[in-house]
């Protein structure tokens, strides 16, 4: 929830108005920031889905492969990507923000990267324990 709240605040707040940051490896810093935010969101969603107990302790490792882990990854990507589209939609009517389809794409790509990173981390954790 905290990550989603931070993304919401960042999405609807008025930008600082400073000059845009220079591109990194040909990718605009804005798109990289979108990707990083939604990678974090998707990883948090995946972790939340794989940790069903209310006290935050895992109920048990999610199988390293199979439908359960794929379902967690798919849901994490879907939830984060849809949240990104909703955030872009909220920006449309704001006078200091705009709806940008490429931002939504960057959000979805970041979500896939974040869910993938969670998968790698969960797999490594399962192998170590």
Show the residue positions of the predicted features:
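Bulky hydrophobic segments
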Residues: 1-101, 112-129
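Conserved post-beta-strand hinge residue in the HATPase_c
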Residues: 104
